[in-house]
Amino acid sequence: MDHVSAARGRPGIALLLTAVALAGPLVPVAAAAASPGTEAGVELATDRRTGSAWLPYWGDTEAAYQDALEHADQLHTVSPFWFEASADRVKGHDGAGNEGVIDGLHRAGIRVVPTVTETPGAAEMAEVIQDPRRRAAHVDALLEMAGSRSYDGVDLDYEMMAATGNRATRERVRAGFNLLTRDLCARLHARGKECVVTVLAQVRGDVYDYRHLGKVADRVRIMGYDLHWSGGEAGPLSSKGWYEQFLRYATDTIPRNKIEVAFPGYGWDWAKGAKGRAGHLTWKEADSLRKQTGADYHFDAASGTPHFTYRKNGTEHEVWYQDAHGVAEQLPLLRKYGVQGTGLWALGFEDPDVWGALRGQ
């Protein structure tokens, strides 16, 4: 999911790499690897919980963790955004592998499926995952991480490789990612762990082979945001029409019970006429900014998203974000296509009323 700020979206990972020092420790492989949810009395989430959410490693991580516990009755899975993979190793961000967080989530009946992003760009990643030896080393590193704590699986969130306009590279990445997910998911399943894949929303075949992923993965998380993003023109992060398009394609290619559509708990602040990228705001920051500047709240019915404008130092700013009203407007589209699974980017970012909206209240 810029990643320190926005954390997600098409350019998000790339900006993260320039904004964050990625010198986290290697995952300790000697740590005891208990089976998922093996503590006495632990009952991991059942199918009555239809939500998942990502837990950031920056900001007020304790508040984000408490947010998960407070809404444990709606969450079957939390994915701490803890790891990133290079060609043959996995590094942890600050706080990665926090056993207090893992144990606390398990006690609440929530699965812990950490997210792994990738650092290689599209061309390098294609080389890694197309080569059997290098692909095996990459999978080994992911499995080493998965076994280092009592994790319930792995969430593979590889977005850097999707950032290519070269058709040949894109096709090589697509074919290689199919091989990678085939191998990784099979080996995770052999260990009794889940294989989750997070993907960009697509309205047709592209880097991610939805049909293949729907066969090998336990769940496919579709990021239902950044239709307009920090490096582009101002506009809604998502829209009803766009949801219709990608849901139609997703449900044609992936079993409905494996699909999760993630909603944003953030927004973008575009300065009109200014060079550079839009600033990132969580819902809480956007709501506070609107109130501080006295801006009027507007809701765009066509997209199902709120927005407002304000002036700062003579420059007009346009802010688009998402709140509970917007989620309530867009959620029926998931139901229309028979999709029950939802996700949230990210814990601690969101409008508190989103949880009620997700319940249909």
Predicted regions, residues:
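A cross-domain feature marking catalytic cores of carbohydrate-active enzymes
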Residues: 55-57, 82, 114-118, 158-160, ...
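Short, well-ordered coil/turn segments that N-cap beta-strands
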Residues: 47-49, 74-76, 108-112, 150-152, ...
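Glycan-binding loop/region signatures in secreted carbohydrate-active enzymes
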Residues: 263-332
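Conserved, mostly hydrophobic/aromatic
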Residues: 78, 156, 220, 261, ...
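Secretory targeting and sorting signals
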Residues: 2-35
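Substrate-binding surface in catalytic domains of secreted glycosidases
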Residues: 88-96, 140, 162-292
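Glycan-recognition patch characteristic of GH18 chitinases/ENGases
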Residues: 37-144
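Acidic/aromatic/glycine-rich contiguous surface patches that form carbohydrate-binding/processing clefts
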Residues: 330-361
